[in-house]
Amino acid sequence: RFVDKLAKVALQDGSERWVYVHLEVQGSAQTEFAERMFVYHYRLYDRYRQPIASLALLADGTPHWRPSQFGYQALGCSIALHFPTAKLLDYAQDQNALYSNPSPFALVTLAHLLTQATRQDMNARFAAKWKLVQLLYQRGWGKQQVIDLFSVLDWMMRLPEQLKRSLWHNIEVLEEQEKM
């Protein structure tokens, strides 16, 4: 069992205290998820003896599955972990806001939602991916950031070989136009 992401961050108020941020990305509804968050939280605390902030990014397609706590009581003792969650599905209703948001996180959220929406239609996925690639070039980001974000999009929004070749052709044409 390994955490998805663990980062050591300094607080902005100038204090010297460290907080470990545990970000768990969950792609499917699992009944034991909240318990796993609890287990990771206490294991991280046991190892580092520092404050742990456990955060959950829910990337599943189940609207009502929203775990946010785990705890238990026994013989007068109790313990609980309450953790904040972000549900990517919540952003599906306002995709226009994601398209216009300049944040790379909005673009990746949009890619995730479009990947889920186009599971059965590769032509629609191609069109969605091409639109996101065009956004990458329009945002004015640096070359490395465009490359990094494209790598994420390419990994998330997989295409059959023929459509992949078409996408690369479109990208080559776009890059030629950008040079002009």
Segment roles from a protein language model:
Residues R1-Q162:
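Conserved single-residue anchors adjacent to enzymatic active/cofactor-binding motifs
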Residues F150-M180:
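Long, amphipathic alpha-helical segments that form or neighbor coiled-coils/leucine zippers used
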